[in-house]
């Protein structure tokens, strides 16, 4: 399965290792969207999920299929799990830039959607709870914003997120997260300056990760 981007973002399926592709969009949206990510349940390969970003880059909807993508059903359109707020309020988001989707290998109804924050559903996408927040609001676990990839370690409960701030891991379904960034040169500096009175003193401003 593959998802596309743009105003006609949709889902394709290949049954021959990618040599050819067919459109599988019965029940999926065709307007007001900008991107879709797709994930297959490892424990129930017939069950597929698709998360859509809206044209304003907020949450458009979560869709599921139980017949290998032949038909799709909308499961939810709220809260705004692709926005910045811990309670899912507000509009807009960053699906144009960051969007990821993963299915728990041991439970086809447990799914994670990452964008600015990471959200979790335990009922196949019908309802959501925030799993971690981009600056740890309201006592929530902190995970750096902008999630681009998510995946489970085989034969374990370990779940990993790749973000603009490095790699994060949870082993307890998101109750707590650990940064795995020791030794990773991931700080992107936009500006740097040297003191005019002390040649050993430098200051730099980095993307997301401090000054």
Regions found by a protein language model. Give the residues of each.
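Beta-propeller blade termini and top-face loops
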Residues: 1-211
């Amino acid at each position: 399965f593959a998802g596309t981007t743009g105003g006609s973002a949709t889902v394709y399926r290949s049954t021959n290792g990618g040599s050819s592709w067919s459109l599988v969009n019965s029940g999926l949206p065709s307007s007001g969207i900008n991107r879709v990510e797709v994930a297959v349940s490892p424990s129930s390969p017939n069950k597929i999920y698709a998360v859509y970003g809206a044209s304003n880059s907020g949450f458009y909807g979560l869709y599921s299929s139980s017949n290998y993508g032949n038909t799709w059903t909308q499961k939810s359109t709220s809260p705004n799990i692709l926005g910045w707020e811990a309670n899912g309020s507000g509009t807009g988001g960053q699906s144009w830039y960051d969007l990821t989707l993963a299915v728990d290998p041991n439970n086809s109804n447990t799914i994670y959607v990452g964008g600015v924050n990471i959200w979790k559903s335990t009922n196949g996408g019908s309802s959501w709870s925030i799993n971690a927040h981009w600056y740890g609001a309201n006592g929530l676990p902190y995970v750096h914003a902008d999630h681009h990839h998510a995946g489970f370690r085989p034969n374990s409960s370990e779940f990993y997120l790749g973000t603009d701030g490095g790699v994060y891991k949870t082993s307890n379904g998101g109750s707590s997260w650990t940064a795995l960034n020791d030794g990773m040169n991931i700080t992107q500096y936009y500006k740097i300056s040297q003191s005019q009175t002390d040649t050993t003193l430098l200051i730099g401003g980095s993307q997301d990760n401090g000054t």
